[in-house]
From Swiss-Prot:
Cell compartments where the protein resides: Nucleus
PROSITE patterns: HTH_MYB
Purpose: Probable transcription factor that may be involved in the jasmonate-dependent defense responses to the rice blast fungus Magnaporthe oryzae. Does not seem to function in the salicylic acid-dependent signaling pathway.
Keyword DNA-binding carried by entry: yes
UniProt keyword annotations, A-Z: DNA-binding, Nucleus, Plant defense, Repeat, Transcription, Transcription regulation
Protein name: Transcription factor JAMYB
Keyword Transcription regulation listed: yes
Record Pfam families: Myb_DNA-binding (PF00249)
Reported induction: Induced by jasmonate (JA), wounding and infection by the fungal pathogen Magnaporthe oryzae.
Transmembrane segments: none
Source organism (scientific name): Oryza sativa subsp. japonica (Rice)
GO BP: defense response; regulation of DNA-templated transcription
Designated gene of the protein: JAMYB
Amino acid sequence: MEMVLQRTSHHPVPGEQQEAAAELSSAELRRGPWTVDEDLTLINYISDHGEGRWNALARAAGLKRTGKSCRLRWLNYLRPDVKRGNFTAEEQLLILDLHSRWGNRWSKIAQHLPGRTDNEIKNYWRTRVQKHAKQLNCDVNSKRFKDAMKYLWMPRLAERIHARAGAVDDSGDYSNNDLSCVSGVTMATVANCFDGSPSMVTSSSSDSFTSESQDLKKINLHVHGDDEKMNSEDWMQEVDHEFWSTEIQPNNEQFQDQQLNGWVQGFSEGLSETLWSLEDIWKMQ
Protein backbone atom coordinates (compact mmCIF):
# COMPACT_ATOMS: atom_id res chain seq x y z
CA MET A 1 0.00 0.00 0.00
CA GLU A 2 1.40 3.31 -1.00
CA MET A 3 1.14 5.87 1.66
CA VAL A 4 1.24 9.50 0.79
CA LEU A 5 2.43 11.79 3.47
CA GLN A 6 1.11 15.23 3.03
CA ARG A 7 3.10 18.12 4.35
CA THR A 8 0.92 20.39 6.33
CA SER A 9 1.70 23.86 7.57
CA HIS A 10 0.47 25.18 10.89
CA HIS A 11 -1.89 28.12 10.62
CA PRO A 12 -2.59 29.94 13.89
CA VAL A 13 -6.19 29.87 14.92
CA PRO A 14 -7.97 33.19 15.56
CA GLY A 15 -7.65 32.77 19.31
CA GLU A 16 -3.89 32.43 19.07
CA GLN A 17 -3.68 35.51 16.87
CA GLN A 18 -5.62 37.55 19.38
CA GLU A 19 -3.44 36.30 22.23
CA ALA A 20 -0.25 37.17 20.35
CA ALA A 21 -1.61 40.61 19.50
CA ALA A 22 -2.57 41.18 23.13
CA GLU A 23 0.94 40.22 24.30
CA LEU A 24 2.51 42.56 21.76
CA SER A 25 0.09 45.34 22.66
CA SER A 26 0.75 44.88 26.38
CA ALA A 27 4.49 45.12 25.84
CA GLU A 28 4.06 48.41 24.00
CA LEU A 29 1.83 50.05 26.61
CA ARG A 30 3.27 52.94 28.55
CA ARG A 31 3.34 52.90 32.33
CA GLY A 32 3.88 55.57 34.92
CA PRO A 33 2.99 59.27 34.97
CA TRP A 34 1.27 60.87 32.02
CA THR A 35 3.23 63.37 29.94
CA VAL A 36 1.98 66.77 28.82
CA ASP A 37 1.85 65.55 25.21
CA GLU A 38 -0.31 62.59 26.20
CA ASP A 39 -2.67 64.85 28.12
CA LEU A 40 -3.04 67.17 25.13
CA THR A 41 -3.60 64.23 22.78
CA LEU A 42 -6.39 62.86 24.96
CA ILE A 43 -7.99 66.29 25.46
CA ASN A 44 -7.93 67.09 21.73
CA TYR A 45 -9.30 63.69 20.73
CA ILE A 46 -12.21 63.87 23.17
CA SER A 47 -12.86 67.47 22.12
CA ASP A 48 -13.18 66.36 18.48
CA HIS A 49 -14.85 62.97 18.89
CA GLY A 50 -16.33 62.92 22.38
CA GLU A 51 -16.10 60.18 24.97
CA GLY A 52 -16.73 56.61 23.98
CA ARG A 53 -15.48 53.10 24.51
CA TRP A 54 -12.21 53.79 26.23
CA ASN A 55 -10.18 50.88 24.82
CA ALA A 56 -11.13 51.85 21.28
CA LEU A 57 -10.59 55.52 22.09
CA ALA A 58 -7.06 54.88 23.35
CA ARG A 59 -6.13 53.09 20.11
CA ALA A 60 -7.81 55.62 17.84
CA ALA A 61 -6.10 58.53 19.60
CA GLY A 62 -2.72 56.85 19.18
CA LEU A 63 -2.12 56.62 22.92
CA LYS A 64 -0.15 53.65 24.17
CA ARG A 65 -2.26 53.52 27.31
CA THR A 66 -4.99 51.21 28.50
CA GLY A 67 -8.58 52.30 28.17
CA LYS A 68 -8.89 52.30 31.95
CA SER A 69 -5.89 54.60 32.29
CA CYS A 70 -7.39 57.03 29.75
CA ARG A 71 -10.76 56.99 31.49
CA LEU A 72 -9.30 57.70 34.94
CA ARG A 73 -7.00 60.39 33.60
CA TRP A 74 -9.90 62.16 31.94
CA LEU A 75 -12.45 61.84 34.73
CA ASN A 76 -10.14 62.60 37.65
CA TYR A 77 -7.85 65.21 36.15
CA LEU A 78 -8.42 66.50 32.61
CA ARG A 79 -12.15 67.21 32.49
CA PRO A 80 -12.79 70.96 32.10
CA ASP A 81 -15.16 71.03 35.09
CA VAL A 82 -12.75 69.34 37.51
CA LYS A 83 -11.83 71.74 40.30
CA ARG A 84 -8.28 72.37 41.42
CA GLY A 85 -6.84 73.11 44.84
CA ASN A 86 -7.97 72.54 48.41
CA PHE A 87 -11.57 71.96 49.38
CA THR A 88 -13.48 75.07 50.44
CA ALA A 89 -15.08 75.36 53.87
CA GLU A 90 -18.47 74.63 52.30
CA GLU A 91 -17.17 71.51 50.61
CA GLN A 92 -15.49 70.24 53.76
CA LEU A 93 -18.62 70.77 55.83
CA LEU A 94 -20.68 68.98 53.21
CA ILE A 95 -18.29 66.02 53.10
CA LEU A 96 -18.44 65.65 56.89
CA ASP A 97 -22.23 65.86 56.90
CA LEU A 98 -22.85 63.47 54.00
CA HIS A 99 -20.29 60.97 55.24
CA SER A 100 -22.08 60.87 58.60
CA ARG A 101 -25.21 59.80 56.69
CA TRP A 102 -23.88 57.58 53.91
CA GLY A 103 -20.47 56.39 55.05
CA ASN A 104 -17.88 55.58 52.37
CA ARG A 105 -20.27 56.01 49.43
CA TRP A 106 -17.89 58.35 47.64
CA SER A 107 -19.70 58.43 44.30
CA LYS A 108 -22.96 59.42 45.98
CA ILE A 109 -21.20 62.13 48.00
CA ALA A 110 -19.46 63.43 44.86
CA GLN A 111 -22.84 64.03 43.21
CA HIS A 112 -23.38 66.91 45.65
CA LEU A 113 -19.96 68.50 45.09
CA PRO A 114 -19.80 69.78 41.50
CA GLY A 115 -16.35 69.46 39.99
CA ARG A 116 -15.06 67.07 42.64
CA THR A 117 -14.46 63.40 41.92
CA ASP A 118 -15.22 60.46 44.16
CA ASN A 119 -11.53 59.55 44.17
CA GLU A 120 -10.58 63.06 45.28
CA ILE A 121 -13.11 63.03 48.13
CA LYS A 122 -11.93 59.60 49.26
CA ASN A 123 -8.32 60.83 49.30
CA TYR A 124 -9.36 63.88 51.33
CA TRP A 125 -11.08 61.69 53.91
CA ARG A 126 -8.13 59.33 54.22
CA THR A 127 -5.33 61.89 54.26
CA ARG A 128 -7.05 64.50 56.42
CA VAL A 129 -9.87 63.12 58.53
CA GLN A 130 -8.48 59.66 59.27
CA LYS A 131 -5.02 61.03 60.02
CA HIS A 132 -6.47 63.52 62.47
CA ALA A 133 -8.42 60.79 64.24
CA LYS A 134 -5.14 58.92 64.59
CA GLN A 135 -3.51 62.01 66.11
CA LEU A 136 -6.29 62.09 68.70
CA ASN A 137 -5.75 58.38 69.43
CA CYS A 138 -9.27 57.37 68.50
CA ASP A 139 -10.92 55.51 65.66
CA VAL A 140 -12.47 57.62 62.91
CA ASN A 141 -15.72 55.64 63.28
CA SER A 142 -15.83 55.90 67.07
CA LYS A 143 -18.56 57.82 68.86
CA ARG A 144 -15.88 59.98 70.45
CA PHE A 145 -14.58 61.25 67.11
CA LYS A 146 -18.04 61.59 65.56
CA ASP A 147 -19.18 63.69 68.53
CA ALA A 148 -16.18 65.98 68.09
CA MET A 149 -17.12 66.52 64.45
CA LYS A 150 -20.82 67.02 65.15
CA TYR A 151 -20.64 69.28 68.21
CA LEU A 152 -17.37 71.12 67.69
CA TRP A 153 -15.84 71.14 64.23
CA MET A 154 -18.91 71.27 62.01
CA PRO A 155 -20.44 74.23 63.92
CA ARG A 156 -17.09 76.03 63.69
CA LEU A 157 -16.99 75.49 59.94
CA ALA A 158 -20.56 76.75 59.71
CA GLU A 159 -19.60 79.92 61.59
CA ARG A 160 -16.82 80.64 59.11
CA ILE A 161 -19.19 80.14 56.18
CA HIS A 162 -21.71 82.58 57.65
CA ALA A 163 -18.99 85.09 58.47
CA ARG A 164 -17.69 85.02 54.93
CA ALA A 165 -21.21 85.27 53.49
CA GLY A 166 -21.79 88.35 55.66
CA ALA A 167 -18.53 89.89 54.51
CA VAL A 168 -19.50 89.32 50.88
CA ASP A 169 -22.93 90.90 51.41
CA ASP A 170 -21.38 93.96 53.05
CA SER A 171 -18.81 94.49 50.32
CA GLY A 172 -21.11 93.63 47.44
CA ASP A 173 -18.33 91.54 45.91
CA TYR A 174 -19.60 88.10 44.93
CA SER A 175 -16.56 87.13 42.87
CA ASN A 176 -15.18 84.90 45.62
CA ASN A 177 -18.48 83.60 46.90
CA ASP A 178 -18.33 79.81 46.68
CA LEU A 179 -21.69 79.27 48.34
CA SER A 180 -23.43 79.12 44.98
CA CYS A 181 -20.97 76.51 43.71
CA VAL A 182 -22.02 73.83 46.18
CA SER A 183 -25.29 71.96 46.38
CA GLY A 184 -28.11 73.48 48.42
CA VAL A 185 -27.48 70.69 50.90
CA THR A 186 -24.68 72.86 52.27
CA MET A 187 -26.98 75.58 53.53
CA ALA A 188 -29.26 72.98 55.12
CA THR A 189 -26.20 71.56 56.84
CA VAL A 190 -25.22 75.00 58.11
CA ALA A 191 -28.75 75.57 59.39
CA ASN A 192 -28.71 72.24 61.21
CA CYS A 193 -25.43 73.15 62.90
CA PHE A 194 -27.08 76.23 64.36
CA ASP A 195 -30.44 74.57 65.10
CA GLY A 196 -32.13 77.45 63.33
CA SER A 197 -31.06 79.97 65.95
CA PRO A 198 -30.00 83.36 64.51
CA SER A 199 -28.23 84.24 67.74
CA MET A 200 -25.89 81.33 67.20
CA VAL A 201 -24.77 82.81 63.91
CA THR A 202 -24.00 86.24 65.31
CA SER A 203 -22.51 85.14 68.61
CA SER A 204 -18.82 85.52 69.30
CA SER A 205 -16.43 82.61 69.02
CA SER A 206 -16.10 82.37 72.78
CA ASP A 207 -19.87 82.22 73.32
CA SER A 208 -20.15 79.50 70.70
CA PHE A 209 -17.27 77.63 72.29
CA THR A 210 -19.02 77.72 75.69
CA SER A 211 -22.24 76.34 74.23
CA GLU A 212 -20.41 73.63 72.33
CA SER A 213 -18.38 72.75 75.42
CA GLN A 214 -21.53 72.10 77.43
CA ASP A 215 -23.00 69.89 74.71
CA LEU A 216 -19.78 67.94 74.25
CA LYS A 217 -19.31 67.56 78.01
CA LYS A 218 -22.72 65.88 78.27
CA ILE A 219 -21.91 63.57 75.38
CA ASN A 220 -18.49 62.51 76.65
CA LEU A 221 -19.60 61.99 80.25
CA HIS A 222 -21.60 59.13 78.83
CA VAL A 223 -18.59 57.89 76.85
CA HIS A 224 -15.87 58.19 79.49
CA GLY A 225 -17.77 57.94 82.76
CA ASP A 226 -15.63 58.96 85.76
CA ASP A 227 -12.24 58.55 84.11
CA GLU A 228 -9.96 60.81 86.16
CA LYS A 229 -7.13 60.77 83.63
CA MET A 230 -9.17 62.14 80.76
CA ASN A 231 -12.52 63.64 81.65
CA SER A 232 -14.78 65.01 78.95
CA GLU A 233 -13.82 68.65 79.48
CA ASP A 234 -10.08 67.95 79.26
CA TRP A 235 -10.53 65.91 76.12
CA MET A 236 -12.72 68.58 74.56
CA GLN A 237 -10.04 71.21 75.22
CA GLU A 238 -7.41 68.92 73.72
CA VAL A 239 -9.25 68.32 70.46
CA ASP A 240 -10.28 71.97 70.24
CA HIS A 241 -6.63 72.98 70.48
CA GLU A 242 -5.87 70.61 67.62
CA PHE A 243 -8.79 71.94 65.58
CA TRP A 244 -8.02 75.63 65.99
CA SER A 245 -4.29 75.91 66.54
CA THR A 246 -4.61 79.70 66.33
CA GLU A 247 -7.57 82.00 66.90
CA ILE A 248 -8.94 83.20 63.58
CA GLN A 249 -10.78 86.51 63.34
CA PRO A 250 -13.05 87.18 60.35
CA ASN A 251 -11.59 89.77 57.98
CA ASN A 252 -14.18 91.63 55.92
CA GLU A 253 -11.59 92.78 53.39
CA GLN A 254 -10.19 89.34 52.68
CA PHE A 255 -11.78 86.20 54.05
CA GLN A 256 -10.18 83.26 52.30
CA ASP A 257 -10.31 79.56 52.96
CA GLN A 258 -6.57 79.34 53.52
CA GLN A 259 -7.20 81.25 56.77
CA LEU A 260 -8.86 78.12 58.13
CA ASN A 261 -5.72 77.14 59.96
CA GLY A 262 -6.77 74.34 62.25
CA TRP A 263 -8.05 70.89 61.52
CA VAL A 264 -9.96 71.96 58.43
CA GLN A 265 -6.96 72.62 56.20
CA GLY A 266 -4.05 71.20 58.15
CA PHE A 267 -5.22 70.28 61.66
CA SER A 268 -2.37 72.06 63.45
CA GLU A 269 0.73 74.02 62.56
CA GLY A 270 2.99 71.15 63.53
CA LEU A 271 1.17 68.67 61.30
CA SER A 272 0.29 70.79 58.28
CA GLU A 273 3.62 70.25 56.54
CA THR A 274 3.28 66.46 56.69
CA LEU A 275 -0.18 66.34 55.11
CA TRP A 276 -0.58 65.99 51.39
CA SER A 277 -2.20 68.65 49.28
CA LEU A 278 -4.52 67.64 46.46
CA GLU A 279 -1.75 68.42 43.98
CA ASP A 280 0.50 65.91 45.76
CA ILE A 281 -2.26 63.31 45.64
CA TRP A 282 -2.71 63.84 41.90
CA LYS A 283 1.03 63.41 41.34
CA MET A 284 0.98 60.09 43.18
CA GLN A 285 -1.73 58.60 40.97
